Amino acid sequence: IEIENVKKHFEDLKKKYSNIIVEGAGGLYVPLIRDKFYIYDLIKMWNLPVVLVCGTKVGSINHTMLTLNALKTMGIKLEGLVFNNYKGQFFEDDNIKVILELSKVKNYLIIKNGQKEISDEEIETFFN
């Protein structure tokens, strides 16, 4: 990956669209250029806010809190949390509750298992 090429394409997209979603597939510490440039570098380079997609299964509390701590330490703005693949299990409800209590994040969405769309109203509420 050549960073200058990525920058150029991003600038071209910004001219064409008012909103752009940049997916940080795999997480903050995934290398885009091994040992040189990571997903978090890309986020910081463009000063992008983050919507953190979280699981709800066992281990989600630790994983989410570690990532939130890393975002805070790096000075990266969190837009909110999206709890993905929610199946309605009692432990998922508890995990979501604990994450929200520990993180003090107020802005979140819950995406149910198999849910294909998010309503315009949900998106408006999330980003405003």
Q: Would you name each region that the model predicts?
A:
Residues I21-E23, V51, V82:
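Structural motif
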Residues P49-G55:
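A contiguous pocket-lining binding segment that forms or flanks enzyme active sites
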Residues I1-F37, K44, T56-M65, N69, ...:
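ATP-dependent carboxylate-amine ligase catalytic core
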Residues L68-N128:
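C-terminal lobe/tail of nucleotide-utilizing enzymes
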Residues W46-P49, K77-L78:
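Short glycine-/polar-rich loops that comprise or flank the Walker A/P-loop
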